[in-house]
C-alpha cells in the first residue's frame, strides 16, 4: 500500500486519518510505504508533454521514486485536506507530474496506464461542518479532483472518508469504521 499525505501537518486531521489507515493496513498484513508530499522535491510541471509519449516525467527529482512506488503498489491511500474546495497545490502538482504516467492521450478518450488491479482510497478533511461542507461544495471539489485523477489512470475506486467540521480532536468513529472496512 502506498500512503500519501498531501498536508504539511502530520498530526492534523488528514495526517491522523492517514496514520490510522497505515496502522490498520499494517495489522492486516499490508506492506506500507508512506510519502509526505511536503517533504519531497517535486518541481512544478512545465507542460512539455514529453511524458505523454514516454509515460514518465523527464524532470529527474523525487517523481522518479514516486513513480516506482505508485507502479508497484496494490492500493493507494491519498489523504488531502480541502483548500478552497480543492486539493492543495502540492497534490495538484503530483497529479500534473503524473499526467503521462497515469494516462496516454488518444483522439477520443484518455487511455489508462495504471493497472486495473490497483485500487485507491481517499481521505479528506474540511473545517466546514456537514451538511454545509457538501452543500457548498467544499469537500466535494477536493474529492472530485482526487477521484478523477485515479479513475482516469485506470485504478478502481475503493471509497472515500470525509471528516467535516474537524474541530474535534479525535477521528470520528464513522470515519474509523469506513477506513477499517476499506483496508480489511
Can you say where each PLM-predicted feature lies in the sequence?
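Glycine-rich phosphate/pyrophosphate-binding loop and the adjoining helix
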Residues: 132-184
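Generic recognition of short, well-ordered alpha-helical segments
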Residues: 16, 46, 89-93, 174
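N-terminal beta1-alpha1 ligand-phosphate binding loop
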Residues: 1-30, 126-129, 163-164
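Helix-loop-strand module that forms the ligand-binding subsite of alpha/beta enzymes
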Residues: 58-147
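A short beta-strand-loop structural module common to alpha/beta enzyme folds
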Residues: 30-41, 160-164
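N-terminal beta-loop-helix "entrance" segment that forms/cooperates
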Residues: 37-56, 168-172
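Residues at the starts of beta-strands that form the adenosine-phosphate
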Residues: 22, 26, 31, 118-120, ...
